[in-house]
Amino acid sequence: MTLRPTADTAAVGRPRVERKRLLVVGRDPGVTAVIAVGLRPRFETEAGITAAEALAQVRGEPLSLIIVDLAHSDLDAAFSIRALAARSPNCQIIVIGSTEHAGIADRLVGLHVHGFFTRPIDFGALVARVSLLSRLADDNSPDAGALALSRCSTHVLAYFSTHYAESFSLATLARAVGVSPGTLARVFLQDTKRSPRSFRCDVRVEVAKQLLAHEDHKLDRVAELAGFVDGSHLSRVFRLHTGRSPGQYRVEIRSPRPEARCASG
């Protein structure tokens, strides 16, 4: 899949291409960040929001897809999904849960739920499902080509979802995935049009966004949790990616607005 060179290029002066809107609902920062970053070529994404926030957002601009991660859900899972579907009847929904959530499928009959993925998440299968739904919904879209991840890149994304804050080399990542460093670099670049380091940086910025939105940690603590050296390092990278300082972003994202909060992805 073709990904943007930074997590938020529109904020630094480039023209924004009109894209479909995607909400990634859930409070697992690694999983939601990897999904948001990986699908940004196709969608304007916002990740790491709660079910209650998602319900408020659906009242605003139309949504194309909602991915609901049931881990640490703030509302009853079936209620949340049914409420989201009722407020956005044409929106497609994909659910992520553990084996204990498998029974929820029986309670969602009749809704536009187009996939149930159990943990550990197969990011390759998830991307393939999203790609198929996107192409079926809009065959004439210039961005409607298939998105695909190799098994190698699928394992890399899974590793990033749990180890994004750690410092590791390409060799360490390759050992974890089970391929040579050269193979990993070549295949991941072919699949995503970027290096593993670039993708991990975007994931860290996305995690920082979620922490700034939902936690009251000081900047150095946000930096530590997201994988940056310190608050100064986070500020430099965050401004490069979003055009705003972390403090500005926190104020803006928490400010009450008359309509649903604007998407931040």
Model-identified regions with their sequence ranges:
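Short hydrophobic/Thr-rich beta-strand motif most characteristic of the beta2 strand and flanking loop
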Residues: 42-50, 57
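Conserved phosphotransfer microenvironments
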Residues: 51, 64-84, 101
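Alpha4 helix (beta4-alpha4-beta5 surface) of REC/receiver domains from two-component response regulators
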Residues: 79, 100-115
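C-terminal output helix
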Residues: 121-130
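The C-terminal output helix
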Residues: 131-146
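Basic, amphipathic alpha-helical hairpins
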Residues: 156-169, 188-192, 209-218, 238, ...
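Basic/polar phosphate-binding segments, predominantly the helix-turn-helix DNA-binding elements
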Residues: 170-202, 223-245
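…primarily DNA-binding HTH/wHTH and HhH modules…
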Residues: 236-265
